[in-house]
């Protein structure tokens, strides 16, 4: 197997044993990008000069046996809404074209401290608003498993790059499923941690009460290794949780005999494709064969997840995106002749169609006369959804179900049909609304397109999710498939 398809864990061993230099790994990755990414279109910007320089510095440390850091010499790709000091961060939007940050996000500081090597910034839906990566102003990323299909979104570039062997891990952000859905579509492992587990400082805000940064990898243990590196409380983020336990690998490999798993009947109901249902039912039988106890439960407010999510997320977006006014930074209209025109024209020209749609929706939901009917009611529904999960977790350790109701759809198929596009978030938005951790792992394929299995856990119990996901992965995975793509 080429270095480009090696796991994070194996690369760490090869580097530690001095069988390969960090600079060799980085060179192999850039060769892979040059060969493959003109087709996949996952990267928006490369940081080649700095990456090679950093790798050469790590070579010197390797020679001195000073290989400090959990990710020493490991290449990484970062979603383009995560601030990177000195490297353009655009959120795949005209509004931020040419914007080069002068500070570092907390997750990037942590990864640099662990001696990971930044390869470049990855494509996404504009300002993380979309489910296919087609709203990007720059390019349309394709699914490595089927180039006619979308990679999912909004972290489509992050998922596609990992699946195609262009980086061993990437970071994405998940507001309503934006890590887990593309992970499912691209056949990789994607974790949305508990809200507050990972600092949001330096994440360009979409919906601040929902956003969470998380890792995408080709296997479960790699995912746990990366989450350990980026987790922890942060004084720069008042919503980060003061939780000391960031050990996610110690229970990987432990069996799941007696583990109580809940299967909500709503997760295999209306709107879920037959091929997805079959794959999930097969996965449930696998879990039973591993000793887990799987029982059907009800999460009755699941159907209200999408409408409440889109009201809340759009309302928060309309507030967060008000900072892009054409004055301080970002796109500045050249046609304006007054301050009012500058505001209007900069935002009209700088934002894409989907972003403007959500700003309009959010502004309407927060407006006088409609606040109680839409925003306030959506927050009440959010509480009901959280209560549903709390009730289930009184008796069960994890919840299982599909990640997405279908496999990846074709490029161009849903981009002009927002309601159909939004329906793809049926099974992921409730997890964000409740602030819970969720992980997607591959569980099958249909017509060559991957199917994702989602495990949902109790708050700050990512350790159990990794444990059950790892055991399932021993029975089904796509490790032998990636290189054939």
UniProtKB/Swiss-Prot annotation:
One of its GO terms (biological process) is translation. InterPro entries: Amidase (IPR000120), Amidase_CS (IPR020556), Amidase_dom (IPR023631), AS_sf (IPR036928), GatA (IPR004412). One of its GO terms (cellular component) is glutamyl-tRNA(Gln) amidotransferase complex. Keywords: ATP-binding, Ligase, Nucleotide-binding, Protein biosynthesis. Signal peptide: none annotated. The active site is at residues 79, 154, 178. The keyword ATP-binding applies. Its EC number is 6.3.5.7. One of its GO terms (molecular function) is glutaminyl-tRNA synthase (glutamine-hydrolyzing) activity. It comes from the Bacteria. It catalyses: L-glutamyl-tRNA(Gln) + L-glutamine + ATP + H2O = L-glutaminyl-tRNA(Gln) + L-glutamate + ADP + phosphate + H(+). Disulfide bonds: none annotated. It is an enzyme of class 6 (ligase). Heterotrimer of A, B and C subunits. Allows the formation of correctly charged Gln-tRNA(Gln) through the transamidation of misacylated Glu-tRNA(Gln) in organisms which lack glutaminyl-tRNA synthetase. The reaction takes place in the presence of glutamine and ATP through an activated gamma-phospho-Glu-tRNA(Gln). NCBIfam families: gatA. Belongs to the amidase family. GatA subfamily. This is Glutamyl-tRNA(Gln) amidotransferase subunit A. It comes from Staphylococcus aureus.
């Amino acid at each position: 197997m080429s270095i480009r398809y090696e796991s994070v864990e194996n690369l760490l061993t090869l580097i530690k044993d001095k069988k390969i230099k960090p600079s060799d790994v980085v060179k192999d990755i850039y060769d892979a990008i040059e060969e493959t990414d003109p087709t996949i279109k996952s990267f928006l910007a490369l940081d080649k000069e700095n990456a090679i320089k950093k790798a050469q510095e790590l070579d010197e440390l390797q020679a001195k046996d000073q290989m400090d850091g959990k990710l020493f010499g490991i290449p990484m790709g970062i979603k383009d809404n995560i601030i990177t000091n000195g490297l353009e961060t655009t959120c795949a939007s005209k509004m931020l074209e040419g914007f080069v940050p002068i500070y570092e996000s907390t997750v990037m500081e942590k990864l640099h401290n662990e001696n990971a090597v930044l390869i470049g910034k990855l494509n996404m839906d504009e300002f993380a608003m979309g489910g296919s990566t087609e709203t990007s102003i720059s390019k349309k990323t394709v699914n490595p498993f089927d180039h006619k299909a979308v990679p999912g979104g909004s972290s489509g570039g992050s998922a596609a790059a990992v699946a195609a062997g262009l980086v061993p891990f990437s970071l994405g952000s998940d507001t309503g499923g934006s890590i887990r859905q593309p992970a499912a579509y691209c056949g990789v492992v994607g974790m949305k941690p508990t809200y507050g587990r990972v600092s949001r400082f330096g994440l360009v805000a979409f919906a601040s009460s929902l956003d969470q940064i998380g890792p995408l990898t080709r296997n479960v243990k790699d995912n746990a290794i990366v989450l350990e590196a980026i987790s922890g409380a942060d004084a720069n983020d008042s919503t980060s949780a003061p939780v000391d336990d960031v050990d996610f690998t110690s229970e990987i490999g432990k069996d799941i005999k007696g583990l109580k798993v809940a299967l909500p009947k709503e997760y295999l109901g209306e709107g879920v494709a037959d091929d997805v249902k079959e794959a999930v039912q097969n996965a449930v039988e696998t879990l039973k064969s591993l000793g887990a106890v799987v029982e059907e439960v009800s999460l009755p407010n699941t159907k209200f997840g999408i409408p409440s999510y889109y009201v809340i997320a759009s309302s928060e977006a309309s507030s967060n995106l008000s900072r892009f006014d054409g004055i301080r930074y970002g796109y500045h209209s050249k046609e304006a002749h007054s301050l009012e025109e500058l505001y209007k024209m900069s935002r009209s020209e700088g934002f894409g169609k989907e972003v403007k749609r959500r700003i309009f929706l959010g502004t309407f939901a927060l407006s006088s006369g409609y606040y109680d009917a839409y925003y306030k009611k959506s927050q009440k529904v959010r509480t009901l959804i959280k209560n549903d999960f709390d009730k289930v977790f009184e008796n069960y350790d994890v919840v299982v179900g599909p990640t997405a109701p279908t496999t990846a759809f074709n490029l161009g198929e849903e981009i002009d049909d927002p309601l159909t596009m939004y329906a793809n978030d049926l099974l992921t938005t409730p997890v964000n609304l409740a602030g819970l951790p969720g992980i997607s792992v591959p569980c099958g394929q249909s017509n060559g397109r991957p199917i994702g299995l989602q495990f949902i856990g109790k708050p700050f119990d990512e350790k159990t999710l990794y444990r059950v996901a790892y055991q399932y992965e021993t029975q089904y995975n796509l490790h032998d498939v990636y290189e054939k793509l």
